[in-house]
Amino acid sequence: MKKIRILDCTLRDGGYVNNWKFGFENIKDTVKRLIQAGIDIIEVGYLSSKGDFSADESQYSSVDAIKRILPADRKNTLIAVMINCGDYDAELLPQYDGTGPDCIRVCFHKSQALQAVELCRKIKDKGYKVYFQPMVALSYSDAEYLGLIGMANKFRPDVFYIVDSHGSMKQKDVARFFYLIENNLDKEIAVGFHSHNNLYLSYSNAQYLAALHTDHNLIIDSSIMGMGRGAGNLNTELFVEYLNETADADYSTEPILCSIDNTIAPIYLTTSWGYSLSGYLSSKYRCHQNYARFLSNKNTLTYVGMNAIFSKIEPEKRDNYDREYIDKLYTAHMSAGGE
């Protein structure tokens, strides 16, 4: 029988809201509270050699920096960190010894698939659990996705992810990718699901996956109060309650509420996230969420006008944000008398 686990990504995906500046003590407190809640996996941020990060940020240039925010007793919780493919050299990773992160998620664009596989192999050779995370699942044809699954079956990551990068997936889309995985991925490899809430479907899509009969173990990503870029993510506090009621889970909600009081709610008061019409439009056209932010921040467009601009974004420009490109579309729209 499948096991369903929660991966909380507040400190990583939530960092898009506040530029990862949670504060050192708040980072430690968030990790502590999630461990107290019994959350299975905590993603503590990004590992990258592309910047010089302070102790107040949930971005780290070394494994030693991650160790400083971890408590001595993690109970049964695993600690994860994400690497964007190309941002960190696996040669810099120390051999896994159980005192730092347990799991490393490798996130990559379609063009980086072979590079990502090689990175995953090196990370796995150092003893870490590896999560294989191809972004923007909807950008893959069935044949392309089956090719990724075939790669995964050869190097055997611990988890293979379905990623709804733009919050565009409806249930039929989740089903499409899940059954490609179910029928072709090695049963020993778990299936992960990372979503964004642009269409208010993160919760229902997660429930759909949780209810499926499958031999694959599942990992569902969520964040406290749904904290994340744009529309945010699945709410940890909601999905915890759902699994407690439907899957005989035993998560504790009070520590999560403590984290909300201590850290997350104060951030929300100054920099909110959640559903927006601009986010809906970016999802409708399967575009990077930064396009929605750019157009919304102009404060000059009607939503009809914004829709018109989104409709002109070429397919090859949708997945990766191009500020110069969207600025040209915006200028052309306004010059033509748009509003």
Model-derived features with residue positions:
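Catalytic cores and adjacent flexible loops of soluble metabolic enzymes
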Residues: M1-E339
